[in-house]
């Protein structure tokens, strides 16, 4: 069916008033390009579930697309013989609460018991609920840190991890077999509540989650003097983060007022990503005013955390790699000192995260495992340890994109856990007369200076994906002989699978002091290049990264 015919069918069948008005406003001639974009395909379902712009159309996030995806998920659970139970959470985004309720209605109509949080909650609380109720799956309605125009639908497996590629393919096939209008079962929300096929998640589940997070503490010293500014970026983090901080005695917490309450329009930060300085500008201003020891920011679904700390009269943003290394060192040091370090401890990070983690782990005798990008792979490593009866060996996991987890209580990155650890670590260093900036600099002095940079090369146009594939093919066929003036001594191609990792379209180049990893984004025509350099000073490391970037840009024709 053509995009135009699909548009006409939707115009005739859609009952939702807002979506119908949106479709009715389109003119088949004047808006032909927009109709094509809305209806030329179904919104893609992958390991991250669904994610797209809100609006009417098969290539948009709306109630009909969500219902159809849920019909496919219910069919998959039955076909796979998994428990017919599914936990549901949602964030502060436009439409999230409704999408969550519609997900519950479709599941219940298909004989799958839906456990629905009664209010917005962080994504890690969804991972927890999946495990708490023994569910076959979980759904979190969120688009993470995308702009306000987006929403999404993340699917989790029975282990509390985001689903694998194989599972995503299987669910996608079931989704494809369901018609948006005639192929979806739906029941009344109130009726399903009455008969128990929709269950509202109680406070016992959330309190148990917070108990599990609190048990990740490794220092019981006084934290009351720590001054914290916190912004949930108008997302889900406020309740859980402030509760967990109060539990451990961090009471001097000032919320950024413009960003304290849930608001899916994100009026003060169009791109609510705590990795970006722009999203934290309001928090930085308040931190300067209150002379805070620490600024924390969590993204709308509260699975990523950014931080800024006093340094030289202003505030310094810590990168995801720096926070990961600081927390790894802190956990190793404290657990070694208090006698809780497990035998044969394991830390996990990704192939694109800093090599400094290897140096820190080796210093403490910790096995460091590396996975492909995506926290689900870190969660899978925890699962492997758990199946071997060795879950206690897991110490910490992080990825350079601001995701952290210090326990096996959930299987996704957890900014509630990260906020607890970061505040505790800051208080511990404060008691020794040090800031986190000074602590990071001390680690650089001890282990050497590591510089990490990310370059994204956008390849627009219909042939963008093909051009990206051609670039990687050419790099594999003839990799550069030198980078940053150093000889390339190692080329690792993950396409055939390396180090027991699944096959992945990733190429790694190494010299004596430089590492470059090249991979496609997977969801858009964008090539990602991760640069890492190790040197005696940060200036030298930065120069090496810059030189490697120039070399690769020249190779790519940038």
Predicted regions located by residue number:
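Short acidic, glycine/serine/threonine-rich loops at helix termini
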Residues: 97-102, 127-131, 149-155, 176, ...
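An N-terminal, well-structured beta->alpha segment
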Residues: 5-103, 193, 198-226, 236
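Conserved phosphate/anionic-ligand binding catalytic regions in large, soluble enzymes, centered on
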Residues: 39-59, 143-144, 232-244, 300, ...
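N-terminal small/polar loop signature for handling phosphorylated ligands or for N-terminal nucleophile
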Residues: 87-150, 247-307
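Phosphate-binding and adjacent anionic-ligand microenvironments
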Residues: 288, 292-294, 314, 334-519, ...
């Amino acid at each position: 069916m053509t995009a135009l015919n699909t548009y006409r069918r939707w115009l005739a069948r859609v009952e939702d008033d807002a979506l119908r008005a949106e479709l009715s406003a389109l003119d088949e001639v004047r808006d032909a390009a927009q109709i094509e974009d809305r209806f030329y395909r179904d919104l893609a379902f992958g390991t991250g579930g669904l994610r797209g712009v809100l609006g009417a159309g098969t290539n948009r996030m709306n109630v009909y697309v969500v219902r159809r995806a849920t019909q496919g998920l219910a069919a998959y659970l039955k076909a796979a013989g998994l428990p017919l139970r599914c936990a549901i959470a949602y964030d502060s985004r436009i439409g999230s609460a409704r999408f969550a309720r519609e997900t519950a209605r479709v599941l219940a109509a298909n004989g799958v018991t839906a456990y629905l949080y009664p209010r917005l909650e962080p994504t890690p609380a969804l991972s927890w609920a999946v495990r708490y109720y023994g569910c076959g799956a979980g759904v979190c309605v969120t688009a993470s840190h995308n702009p306000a125009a987006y929403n999404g639908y993340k699917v989790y497996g029975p282990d509390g991890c985001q689903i694998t590629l194989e599972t995503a393919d299987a669910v996608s096939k079931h989704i494809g077999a369901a018609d948006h209008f005639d192929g979806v079962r739906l029941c009344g929300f109130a009726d399903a509540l009455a008969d128990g096929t929709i269950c509202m998640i109680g406070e016992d589940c959330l309190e148990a989650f917070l108990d599990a997070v609190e048990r990740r503490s490794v220092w019981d010293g006084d934290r009351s003097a720590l001054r914290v500014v916190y912004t949930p970026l108008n997302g889900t983090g406020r309740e859980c983060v402030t509760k967990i901080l109060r539990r451990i005695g961090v009471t001097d917490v000032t919320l950024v007022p413009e960003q304290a309450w849930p608001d899916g329009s994100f009026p003060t930060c169009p791109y609510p990503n705590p990795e970006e300085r722009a999203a934290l500008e309001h928090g930085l201003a308040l931190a300067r005013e209150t002379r805070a020891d620490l600024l924390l920011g969590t993204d709308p679904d509260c699975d990523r955390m950014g931080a800024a700390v006093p340094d030289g009269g202003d505030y310094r943003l810590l990168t995801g790699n720096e926070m990961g290394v600081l927390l790894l060192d802190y956990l190793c040091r404290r657990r070694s000192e208090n006698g809780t370090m497990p035998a044969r401890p394991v830390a996990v990070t990704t192939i694109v995260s800093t090599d400094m983690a290897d140096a820190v782990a080796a210093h403490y005798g910790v096995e460091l495992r590396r996975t492909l990008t995506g926290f689900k792979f870190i969660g899978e490593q925890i699962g492997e340890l758990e199946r071997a009866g060795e879950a206690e060996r897991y110490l910490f996991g992080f990825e350079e994109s601001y995701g952290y987890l210090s326990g096996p209580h959930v299987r996704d990155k957890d900014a509630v856990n990260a906020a607890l650890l970061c505040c505790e670590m800051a208080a511990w260093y404060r008691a020794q007369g040090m800031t986190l900036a000074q602590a990071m600099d001390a680690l650089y002095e001890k282990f050497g200076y590591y510089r990490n940079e990310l370059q994204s090369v956008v390849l627009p146009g219909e042939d963008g994906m093909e051009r990206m594939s051609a670039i990687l093919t050419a790099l594999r066929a003839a990799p550069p002989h030198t980078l940053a003036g150093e000889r390339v001594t190692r080329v690792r191609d993950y396409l055939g699978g390396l180090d027991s990792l699944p096959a992945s379209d990733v190429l790694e180049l190494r010299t004596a002091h430089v590492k470059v990893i090249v991979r496609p984004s997977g969801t858009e025509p964008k090539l990602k290049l991760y640069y890492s350099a190790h040197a005696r000073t940060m200036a030298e490391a930065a120069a090496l990264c810059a030189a490697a970037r120039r070399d690769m840009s020249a190779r790519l024709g940038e």
